[in-house]
């Protein structure tokens, strides 16, 4: 279908009639685009601005965007779409526009009273962003922060600036309030929280009355699924909200502070269809843990996945007419150990719609793979007990290394190769903690497993339980062991590129050149040998024998059957018999036996209906 036949135009030059829109919604261009794939957005959040040319060469058309016939943006981040839908409860559609930053001057006029911005990383201080920009030295500003500043400059310099107030929301708003960057960026008010709240609408009413907004406002998160708004328009990457909250109570996590809610199946699917209707061919269900959906506030603990409910939801999403691609969001690794059958059957349902190909790793006929985002964070049991004591439930956190290895075995077997985040330099981290994490990384390598390990320097994010704590803040503060952990992760991440001899060779040679030219002076004395490790300058065993690196000790990893035995007796009834490896003493549980007999005698019975709720009402 041609652009004009679908109502899509690729540029808009006409000025709006009248005095501009009453309310203008926007976001940085780097957070809006989706046609170049997920990789470019992740790169823009991490790479310094001076490396933008690399992305420009690989994706020369990344700035080209699509418009609706009226000049409004064809797609927007999900948060902006939720705000738009929330405002439409109070205001006329003709009073509101979502536009790209380059088109702000076409919609802002004397009648404009509010410009509302959603931004993820305006100052470049999220988990991964500061790490890789500071490694390279000359600029710590990542690409997406540059484009955020460019957007704010356009808003601040508009000739009608005196007529409107600028409100900022999104996950990066705290960066502005914490650094007091209001005047620098031309921001009047930072709003923390969701746009569905009555407080958010009250702020818009206040601004429209001409009243001065407070600099910072905290608004409430919806407390139940009925309060959450689903937009009816296309979102960037086809993001459709699936759950809020998580429930594992990690100290460093912002979303876990939100209520644990799984959203209704029918409303999720309706938003999927809305994305397809507006031209989207890719869908991603947004969640902090995909495996809790269908098991929130039921008679079964959320860390035992509702297999039938999840299969039903994902099958309906990928089989929606018009959906050509589906990308997984966040997950935890313990559920893979709890229910490997779920991983197997889910793979059968969704992998054919994955746009990700990993020829060196995948056993899929078309070399397709699934790459969810999974938190490893640390391999140290001592650190895990302090930072994330519930990360491994239903298994005890003492078994975290075994849960990670066994979970990764199950995932890899079915062509899941997760992107696993690690935190380096958290408060009170010791050399022993770093060694314990390296032990896990080397164990993954010894067992020929694979994950994309994404290390980042500790960032005490606003409103987390660790706000106000201090760990490593700059790369030149990293110890040699911490540098080794970072470089070992990135060396292992090169494995998917081993299909060609030249790609890893060029990368490693380039690393040595950068080290000799600049990086050895910028990143401290502990950087040199880890960089040689990354570049493959000499065998790791030799560097270890010289005392320059830590090689990682082999770990004793429990089998899945041994892990199942560590589950509390009261929880064993929720382990499904068809997953295998069931310990003998599980049979002694009366609840487990009752459950087993009931399922055997009721073939049509499924966990989709055994939650104790009416299935139609919930899903």
Enumerate the language-model features and the residues they cover.
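Radical SAM enzyme core and accessory elements
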Residues: 1-54, 488-619
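N-terminal [4Fe-4S]-dependent radical SAM core
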Residues: 3-22, 34-38, 72, 201-240, ...
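N-terminal pre-triad scaffold of radical SAM enzymes
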Residues: 20-24, 29-30, 221-256, 269, ...
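A solvent-exposed, charged loop/short amphipathic helix patch at secondary-structure junctions
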Residues: 39-70, 122-150, 300-305, 386-396, ...
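Glycine-rich beta-alpha loop elements in corrinoid/cobalamin-binding modules
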Residues: 79, 97-225, 230
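Flexible glycine/acidic-rich beta-alpha junction loops that bind and position SAM and/or redox cofactors
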Residues: 115, 124-127, 177-178, 284-300, ...
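Catalytic cores of alpha/beta
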Residues: 177-185, 428-443
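Conserved SAM/AdoMet-binding glycine-rich loop
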Residues: 274-417, 424-426
